[in-house]
Amino acid sequence: MRLLLINPKYPESFWSFKWAVDHVLPNKRAINPPLGLATLAALCPPSWQVEIVDENVESIPLDPAADLIGVCGMGVQFQRQSELLCYYRSKGYYVVAGGSFASLCPERYALLADTVVAGEAEYIWPRFCAEFDRGCAAGLYRETGVVALSDSPIPRFDLLKLDRYSTATVQFSRGCPFRCEFCDIIVMFGRKPRNKSLGQIEGELDALRSLGITNVFFVDDNLIGRPSAAKELLRGLIEYQRRHRCAFRFGSEVSINLAQDAELLQLMRDANFGWVFIGIESPDPQTLKDTRKVQNTRQDVLSSVRAIYAYGIDVLGGFIVGFDNDTLESFDGQYRFIMKSGIQAAMVGLLTALPKTPLYERLQREGRLRESDHALDNTKLATNVVPKHMGYDQLLAAYQRLYRRLLTDRAIAERIRHKLRYLRRPVYAGEYPLPQRFAIVWRLLFKGILAGGPSRLGHFLRTIPWTSPRKIPLTVVDWIAGLAMQDYVHRHFRHKSPRDQPGIDRKFAALRNVIGEHLRAGRVALATHAVQIDMALSLDRLAGRRFFDQLARRLDHLLSVRDATLKLTIERLLSRDVAGVDRLLTRLARHGDRISIVLNTQLVHLVRVDSSRFRLLLTDAAA
């Protein structure tokens, strides 16, 4: 049996760190690989041939040699996951839907897939495989019991193209003991944390070490949900690295009560945990109590962050605005806290009510849910929550202002200085060989620091801890993270200005002049709708290299207007012009997240469109 497992492309967000991946990190395409698919592959029968394709780092095959296709997805991937399921099903493939959103809302997939797998896969996926082999697969496999993680196999890391990611991922535990109102983790995994054995984790590290991987993210939603189990794990990791004379670099998500356990902090430091991500949400104690985040109220949050810094462990933070207790003044409180804390990777999101969560059910009762296409992604400029003490537009405007304030060059530099004041002897010392480190710093300087002019250079130089060289790698990482987030805000949070339209109009006119002959002959159709450019190519005669080079240059200029988007439909093309299209797409790849491409079904095997860079529209194919 031939199984193709696909991880759909994520919509870009702060978590993508796109600027860093594209311009600074060496030969990387994404941050984390799809661990769930690697685990699913390990649960398949030994006789099955399994392939994993992650659309975030490679293009999807349009006509794969597969007997069935599984497409996973989180909520933010639902739109693309739906497109892929529909496309492959229309081509005659048996398709299976899975992932966290299918686990939370399997009913959303009833018309999209032949089979839906909902819940943890360790028991239900082997059952599906056996029944599929016998030709009697059901439409829904739902885990309703408790999965013992001792039954979870070593993921098939060998099926992942790990060299394309900045980290590898492992999972020690599932579940969280806390009761945050907005969180879907306890809905899916429960409040009683379960964990793998130390032997299982050592087996996974053996597999990664054999592949040359030593940078690892524990994807547990709360690694210290059971502190005693976490301490046992950490002692095991320390001994494992000593025994094998190797040094891993670890990071994970934890709750803020880590700061109250000196033994746990020391163990994390000794085990080489260089960073932790903490859901801080709000500095306001009343807001934390209202949303049931009581673990954050037991000690001053700023003091807790600094206590973690004292052990050389960096803190990444999650924050939320739009709680019921929030007013417009709350945004100033968030700003002051984030600046004082020194947290560079401060992921601020709009309060979003995920289906099946206590928050969703409460707001539904109160009639305070909005319809929103972005209700599954709280970093977009939309939410499904009706705010209580401000207007919806006021919420969005204040959110944008907050991020713009946080991501000025001055604010980035100030947070670094605040952090380094408390972060002693950082665990993080760089994660690449020395030649690659020099290359990263070089690219940061020329593509990030110097590109920002003398002012940014001045801020950068004033953050370098010249007398504490051990802190320099962390300073470099913070500048990379800060500039990546700044780039995202500049591209996605920018108000559309009437002044943009003349720029579009001038460049559009220049494009029409260049391709005028083809327009008049009907071989090219061209239209604009505000900042959306629609172009259709129906080239029934040889266009030639010069045409495609001029087209690439003019479209590149048009797309340099930040809000401009392009939908390119290729209806007809001679084989001798394929090289021209390849050059066109290569030139436009840097704008790929704003370019949608539609191919005539007869051209899908002739024209190579990298769906990991462009949005390849599958349900809108030209006839």
For every predicted segment, state its role.
Residues 1-215:
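Acidic, low-complexity intrinsically disordered segments
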Residues 88-94, 246-248, 273, 313, ...:
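A short helix->loop->beta-strand "cap" motif at the edges of active sites that frequently abuts
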Residues 10-19, 105-108, 227-228, 286-291, ...:
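Flexible glycine/acidic-rich beta-alpha junction loops that bind and position SAM and/or redox cofactors
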